[in-house]
Amino acid sequence: MTVTFDPQSGHEQKGRRPALVISNDQFNQRTGLAIVCPITNTKRNVPFHVALPPESTVTGFVMVEQVKAIDFRARQARFIEKAPEAVLNEALSLLDACIY
């Protein structure tokens, strides 16, 4: 999806950019929120970034360390494409490593 991350603070990503939704549909529908990780095109060799595959419409790297809950309606989120399951699983695994 693309989403507007403004307002932001400090090192948080800002502006309108693609993001990977890591929350499930049930959570999204019941809360009106989505848990997302922004995507950047800047390669930083950060261990918490997941590269998107070349065949993906969206290019870049999922920034797992920038996980955020957003009101997807208020932030005017728009669907782009479904992420490959391998990308989602790697992002969830890295998030788990960050939290536990």
Per-region residue spans from a language model:
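Conserved functional hotspots at enzyme active or ligand-binding sites that engage polyanionic ligands
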Residues: M1-Y100
